[in-house]
């Protein structure tokens, strides 16, 4: 019997490698910019940009650019996102509530805070942050779990000219791995250790030895099936050898690698560029200004050193012992003959001019203005502003650029949550238990499986099957960790509502009327609490009136009311109160 040729073999891998090389050529300019920006961030950019003025001399690199980026990263970490899942149909309300409580647990188990931080560094440095949302079948002892990883944009490739990676027919994710470890895991790689691909790398001070490493390619591609549905398939290969291919897997050949049919990568550009999913960042904008500042710093440093060191103009006929003159420890310098101003004189170096310092400071202010990293955003204030509320207001007004960046990050976070829910739907076959924080603040253990997310039959109507419906959700993102100003503002709002009597049961109607024209975060919880207080007040008033009627009856005609009837009426009043 002749073995059938697998759908993905050496020929298909060779074709994919040719496509990858074409994608690499179209991304070469971006790769060069990424490597360059990394040097700028590490303040080692003079390694690539040698200044003729600085050959053989110290190459100063001030940290204004780094400080700006570090402050923006701090803003991002102050506003760590939290998901809130909303149902689109009333039948899915319970599932949405459970998802809202377990999604933060899934993110925590995936070490999402570290992923969020690393991605923000790359977003600010490179202009684009990329996260990968995968299913790791080896996690939890083979049970499997969702994995979220920060991706290196330098090792990702897509079709040139597309603005959305989902429109690319192929997508490649590359990684460098130890060849011996690869051979131990995949024996078919033995004897095929010669790497056939070259990848761009960041520059390192000590160099990076890659002689014992091979390039592993994760190849994602979209392919229509017989019914016209677009399936996502996946192939991992190294040095021309197929390590795994979903089309070669009978369980996935007709289904696709992931049911959602999307590339499992989420791009979050800082400043968008046309016809590219990748954007540009603050380093690209601030390079020129930082270069000018560095050059001025170098010239000023040289001037200060020259001005602080005494030098002389010495004629050949002066007869001065140069060795003794240069030795500052000697108190006496011998001279042969007579010295005159024409043969020996000090060399004066002009000091720094005030306009030079002003110009350098103006370039520093320009860099701050370009990056939106003005003094007020870091707590500094102009003269005369001393009130804490005024300083906080200035900080909030100056942080609109940070809020704009956070909104784009929250949109990307919502797309990541949709991918997580899709992976739950596909792979959470067994019921799992999650420890969550309940509404009362205590621990609760919530069971959950993918069955709650899968399509359910709609039943019959008039003898006709209505088919099935898959639950669909909307995700609203809010900040889990807030800045100090946001927390103080929220606390002040709560105190004002309390002082104005919003939570007094007798003021429920007036408080609800005021809340209708107010807008602040968490207003729905406040409305719910005010309504509960109003309902409780109504029940309490009704119970008090009924008890008053009982007292009248008891005082007027005690002999006509049996003890059993009195107890029955009192118990009914207590039930109404509860």
Which functions belong to the PLM regions below?
Residues 1-254, 351, 355, 359-362:
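Extended, helix-rich architectural segments
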Residues 1-57, 108, 123, 131, ...:
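C-terminal anchoring/interaction modules
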Residues 278, 282-286:
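Acidic/polar low-complexity segments with low predicted structural confidence
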């Amino acid at each position: 019997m002749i073995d059938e040729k697998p759908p993905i073999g050496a020929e298909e891998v060779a074709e994919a490698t040719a496509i990858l090389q074409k994608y690499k050529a179209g991304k070469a300019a971006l790769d060069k910019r990424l490597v360059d920006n990394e040097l700028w961030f590490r303040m080692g950019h003079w390694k690539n940009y040698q200044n003729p003025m600085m050959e053989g001399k110290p190459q100063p690199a001030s940290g204004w650019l780094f400080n700006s980026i570090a402050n923006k990263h701090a803003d991002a970490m102050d506003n760590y996102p939290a998901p809130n899942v909303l149902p689109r149909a009333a039948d899915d309300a319970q599932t949405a509530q459970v998802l809202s409580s377990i999604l933060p647990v899934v993110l925590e188990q995936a070490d999402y805070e570290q992923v969020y931080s690393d991605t923000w560094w790359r977003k600010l440095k490179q202009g684009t942050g990329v996260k990968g949302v995968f299913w790791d079948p080896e996690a939890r002892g083979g049970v499997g779990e969702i994995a979220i990883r920060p991706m290196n944009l330098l090792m990702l490739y897509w079709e040139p000219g597309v603005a959305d990676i989902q429109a690319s027919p192929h997508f490649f994710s590359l990684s460098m791995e130890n060849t011996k470890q690869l051979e131990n895991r995949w024996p078919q790689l033995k004897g095929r250790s010669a790497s056939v691909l070259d990848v761009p790398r960041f520059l390192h001070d000590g160099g990076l030895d890659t002689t014992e490493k091979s390039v592993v390619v994760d190849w994602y591609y979209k392919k229509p099936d017989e019914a016209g549905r677009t399936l996502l398939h996946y192939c991992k290969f190294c040095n021309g050898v197929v390590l795994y291919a979903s089309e070669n897997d009978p369980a996935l050949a007709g289904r696709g690698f992931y049911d959602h049919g999307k590339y499992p990568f989420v791009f979050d550009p800082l400043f968008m560029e046309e016809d590219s999913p990748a954007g540009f960042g603050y380093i690209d904008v601030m390079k020129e200004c930082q270069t000018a500042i560095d050059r001025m710093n170098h010239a000023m440093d040289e001037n200060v050193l020259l001005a602080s060191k005494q030098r002389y103009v010495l004629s050949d006929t002066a007869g001065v012992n140069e060795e003794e003159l240069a030795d500052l420890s000697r108190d006496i310098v011998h001279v042969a003959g007579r010295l005159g101003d024409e043969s020996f004189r000090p060399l004066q170096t002009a000091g720094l001019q005030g306009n030079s310092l002003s110009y350098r400071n103006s370039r520093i202010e320009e860099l701050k203005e370009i990056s939106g990293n003005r003094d007020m955003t870091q707590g500094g204030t102009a003269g005369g502003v001393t009130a804490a509320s005024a300083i906080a207001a200035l900080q909030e007004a100056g942080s609109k650029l940070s809020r704009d960046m956070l909104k784009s990050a929250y949109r990307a976070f919502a797309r990541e949550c949709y991918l997580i829910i899709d992976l739950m739907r596909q792979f959470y076959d067994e019921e799992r238990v999650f420890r969550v924080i309940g509404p009362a603040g205590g621990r609760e253990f919530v069971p959950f499986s993918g069955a709650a997310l899968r399509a359910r039959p709609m039943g019959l109507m008039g003898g006709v099957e209505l088919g099935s419906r898959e639950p669909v959700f909307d995700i609203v993102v809010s900040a889990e960790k807030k800045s100090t100003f946001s927390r103080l503002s929220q606390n002040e709002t709560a105190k004002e509502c309390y002082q104005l009597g919003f939570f007094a049961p007798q003021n429920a109607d007036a408080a609800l009327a005021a809340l209708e024209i107010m807008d602040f975060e968490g207003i729905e919880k406040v409305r719910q609490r005010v309504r509960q207080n109003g309902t409780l007040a109504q029940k309490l008033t009704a119970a008090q009136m009924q008890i008053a009627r009982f007292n009248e009856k008891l005082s007027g005609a005690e002999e006509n009311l049996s003890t059993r009837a009195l107890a029955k009426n009192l118990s009914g009043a207590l039930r109404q109160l509860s």
